[in-house]
Amino acid sequence: MRFKLDGRIIFSKDVEEETQKDIVEVLENGDIFLKGVPEGKENEASKIETYEFDGKDLKLKMTSGTYTRAHEGIVRLKKPIMEKVGRKHQIGIRDVAIDRYVVTITAEPSKVSELKGLKVPECEVELEGEKINIVFENLGDGELKRNIIDRAIKFVKNELDKQDKDLTFEVCKIAPGTIVSDYKAKREITFDTDPTELAEPYGWVKRFPGRGQWFYTAPMAKLFRAFESLIIEECIDKIGFDECLFPKLIPLDVMYKMRYLEGLPEGMYYVCPPKREPEMFQDFVNEMMIKKEIPIEKLKTLLRDPAYVLAPAQCEPFYTFFDHELVDVDHPSKFFDKSGWTYRWEGGGAKGLDRVNEFLRGECVWMGTPEFVETVRDDTLKYAENLAEKLDLEYWTEVGDDPFYLEGRKTEARGIEFPDVPKYEMRLWLPHIKEERKGVAVTSANIHGTHFVEGFGIKDYKERKVWTGCTGYGLTRWVIGFLAQYGYNYDDWPELIQKKVGKLPEIPKLITWP
């Protein structure tokens, strides 16, 4: 996608020459738009093509690709401009206005022509060969905060996706996004602050240098372990899962068999083993000592080709355990793992404590007859909902629209059996998001049919049907959903959590932090 914007930042008074000079310093700092942009994608970030001062207005022409899109870029300018000139020149920003904004999506001309006559609220849609131009005019700060632009883009892309007959929609007997159950909290939820905004000032977390990673200090760790214990007691143990220790370094061949490499190749951390040549690494060390920087290019020459990924789904070792084995569906298997981190590369999508690249989960995986697999999936979801209700956490459960294992199957493969509903997703409400009702996904309950059974050559010794399923209890997200509804005041927490946590430990005592 490409974005082209004509807009204005409107100040509280005419912008004088000295003020203009300071603002120009901000405008010429391209790093403002690079935060959250993956390495190698810098040319996709916002770029100011031209600027002009006219009375109270700073007129801007901006372009971008898909990272730090132009409408996000113009908003991102407000804070550094005010930090530079607000107090110094006694000036404020009254509004951000977008006079004209063109979002261009490219697709096959035949697909574009199918959108003829498409009407999208708040904008015009223009079709031109392989281009779909979504044109907005006269948008203010209010429209930007209501995410009108993003919703319109999503709407048009969904119309395109319908033409592809996405396998999830083909397979699912209930429309993805359908809410199948919900629960309203009995108490009044008064806390409405993003928990990420308070976690660091309170000393519960500290930013780690890696993108999408955090250092969780003792109070947060205690809350994590409390939820881990509750999920095991209230959900996992009641169904009778056996704990195992799953590897987290997964060979690429395993991901290929899972078809994960087809579905989400850009969402994993790839691991390159080093060459066992100490003398070559000595050159690397010597250069680093002399230059006082890490010689990345030399390091690349010392690494073998990618051979592994860090576990992005956590259930991968389960299918490998049964690879080309004969099983007896009369003796089904139910394993769970909570032995370490799960890793997904979110790129620019990583934000706050709820969308991270490194997170904790309790992963349940099972295998048996289709009836057994469906019953277990329903139980894993039912007990998660029961736990939320015991804690008076407001939630809803919906039919998922993105079962991870279907990403690698854009068309239905002959002979593969799929369930009527591949995925249910349970979400805890996030009250601090005002524009729309948003929730953080805390439990994902999936049935794979014969997808993995076929991929790994697993058979029943009597040639009966074998299915698999998995449910992930997102420990990190359960904690964030809980804090979003209850806040950080221990006395406001439900008794069940207080008993599990016990006395909250103190935060580290430093002079300069938090």
From Swiss-Prot:
Pfam families: tRNA-synt_2b, tRNA_bind_4
Co-factor requirement: Zn(2+)
Subcellular location: Cytoplasm
Classification via Gene3D superfamilies: 3.30.70.1920, Bira Bifunctional Protein, Domain 2 (3.30.930.10)
A GO molecular function held by the record: zinc ion binding
GO BP, sorted A to Z: selenocysteine biosynthetic process; seryl-tRNA aminoacylation
Entry text on domains: Consists of two distinct domains, a catalytic core and a N-terminal extension that is presumably involved in tRNA binding.
Subunit structure: Homodimer.
Function: Catalyzes the attachment of serine to tRNA(Ser). Is also able to aminoacylate tRNA(Sec) with serine, to form the misacylated tRNA L-seryl-tRNA(Sec), which will be further converted into selenocysteinyl-tRNA(Sec).
Protein name: Type-2 serine--tRNA ligase
